[in-house]
């Protein structure tokens, strides 16, 4: 029996298939969104939004109107369903093929059908395929029925709520690219339900009919409704294609498993969860197994991409996902950090496609473990809080739902665990009240998710009514006094906060900077008579109210209390990085040209990150020029000043404003009081900015760019360090250079020459070794490949040969030579270090698939592998075993 394709093989086949259709294969974009309107990348097309609007389709210097990707996506709008159903995921892989003004509906439909049903690709049963189309899209309906031959009864026509992307965009928006879509479904059979395709038309729900692919035809630019309330859809400059095939969905069909958690990626993780917890994957606890498995995969990818657990933005969402996993691990009996041990399994299954997982495995494991250690302590605090509530209640009474939700929202306490402990006291839980509070919080989260980044402290809108804007005194000082105006939790005003509790605190004035303009919010301490607390984060509302996330360490904090705020010493490092960001921006415009526009930034104590528009990677010379310009500003020790002025005056003075950013009538302008020279031209820095900065450029200290990478079409990302962080990084490089020089018996100054000489020697040795291996292979092959065994298998002429001491390129070269000399349709060459299968074009056209064959043979040879229809390879340890499986592999 043929082994089902692995998820990795399905991914590779998809990308290779579209490469054969003239598509440029691009790597996945980071889970960090390429634009500031969303926290995470939520769709395969997101990195290409500008291309859909007409921007040149050039990627790292390669022009291509056809692109294919495997995109890692994060969606958390319905995270509470993850694990409770077997289809919801917070992280999923979206396979996509895209056209920017090239092919359109006909090709998109034909190629999707070919890939799904073609025997050399996915081989799905054509009779089990069903589709939906937009009710007015006769063009797509015609292609499905007339070109493909799909019976009309296998097609449903739906309105814009179902078959338009974004859903119901004509009436509800958002503005921008949109168009009708056609969804492809697969009938999994009566084992998954006795409903029919006709039933699906009425219910829109089915476990039996699984959507596997959505073909979107973005051809319109949605505008505001006209005066009569009718949709306005203008034609885009050209018609586009945006498709999304759910990799996990297709894998469940191809592998014939009942759900995502039974596929080859999730199953090992679920089994490991059962092993760590001692709880089998069955019954009610299976929900927790699935939550832990899914969330650890999601968090591993998010953290590997550079998001750190925090109380703001992406870090806050990552923390929510991680803490939900920890809660469910706790319900399985895991009282000590264990989930970090699962990261290795995620890397094993996905690291080949996403090498950032491999490169950052240690950091991910350390981050997950630290979060486990911290939150398990918080869970214990929740237990104490619940015990305090229950101890004063009579048997037969009911714990109010708001208190149950506070335990969940503040301490991450599962309501199931709350109910279980309450029963020991003879107390029930108001589940309806809990559900009401939870739904209220979810509505706020969904609203923020739909339109962009939600505020960390969402849910306080009503509670904030009537509060004045906070007076910020932190530009000139890092400590200051203020009065507590409000204590907020779960959208409600509190009268006091006891020790061990965490909530949002509003002060009359504050030295803590509220996150904005790319600069992270300040942390530090609050102190008052008889108490103290940790300020974990600071945010700011649009109305200018500063929100401090405070954990009370000792004493009790009450509304009206006078407090003293002390900003963390990290502020100095943040200021260095923020001013350095301004200088970096000015230097980039000088070196790369005025077309450079800021696309986003993050300024923190440990580093700065700067996203900007530029079509190609920077050269080493350009990076050096930028670093030199910044260093000139630092050496000159110019004053850094700021003042508020009308926006028209600021723009007239040449202040740089962020493209697309909305400003008020009066703006704050930060200026470096001195220019530096670049090629005979004076370069200056003056920007609209509300952030905190150093007082003189000399305070920045050392500056170094540590990376330059592509994050989206036409968008680059620089990461850089300033001050102590830069010095430490440079010292580490110098130490590494000294150690390397010592190992090579030279000085650091002579390291380049020494390495160059060794490389030359190595290349010469490799060349000699390769030549010797080729000669050895030719000797073993015999004249004209006479040593090979040739026979008919599965309608193909197959030549096979075992070689000794041959691997890598020489093994592939031997396969090429044997294919030329033997006249065979397929050749199979094996050694105890590798296996190669190659097929002629004619053989591939007749259904041969080297990748499928190599998978079967590798399994018998103690290894695994895969590849394209015409060429595939594997690592094995038993050549005889692999070749011995040939007769049964066809």
UniProtKB/Swiss-Prot annotation:
GO cellular component: cytosol
GO biological process: alanyl-tRNA aminoacylation
Catalytic activity line of the entry: tRNA(Ala) + L-alanine + ATP = L-alanyl-tRNA(Ala) + AMP + diphosphate
Compartments, as annotated in UniProt: Cytoplasm
PROSITE patterns: AA_TRNA_LIGASE_II_ALA
Residue positions binding Zn(2+): 578, 582, 689, 693
Principal location: cytoplasm
EC identifiers of the protein: 6.1.1.7
Keyword check for Zinc: yes
Cofactor: Zn(2+)
Record key words, sorted: Aminoacyl-tRNA synthetase, ATP-binding, Cytoplasm, Ligase, Metal-binding, Nucleotide-binding, Protein biosynthesis, RNA-binding, tRNA-binding, Zinc
SUPFAM superfamilies referenced in this protein's UniProt entry, alphabetically: Class II aaRS and biotin synthetases, Putative anticodon-binding domain of alanyl-tRNA synthetase (AlaRS), ThrRS/AlaRS common domain, Translation proteins
Keyword Transferase part of the UniProt annotation: no
Gene3D superfamilies: 2.40.30.130, 3.10.310.40, 3.30.54.20, 6.10.250.550, Bira Bifunctional Protein, Domain 2, Threonyl-trna Synthetase, Chain A, domain 2
GO molecular function per UniProt: alanine-tRNA ligase activity; aminoacyl-tRNA deacylase activity; ATP binding; tRNA binding; zinc ion binding
Binding note for cofactor: Binds 1 zinc ion per subunit.
NCBIfam families cross-referenced by the UniProt entry: alaS
Family to which this protein belongs: Belongs to the class-II aminoacyl-tRNA synthetase family.
Domain statement: Consists of three domains; the N-terminal catalytic domain, the editing domain and the C-terminal C-Ala domain. The editing domain removes incorrectly charged amino acids, while the C-Ala domain, along with tRNA(Ala), serves as a bridge to cooperatively bring together the editing and aminoacylation centers thus stimulating deacylation of misacylated tRNAs.
Function: Catalyzes the attachment of alanine to tRNA(Ala) in a two-step reaction: alanine is first activated by ATP to form Ala-AMP and then transferred to the acceptor end of tRNA(Ala). Also edits incorrectly charged Ser-tRNA(Ala) and Gly-tRNA(Ala) via its editing domain.
Stated name of the protein: Alanine--tRNA ligase
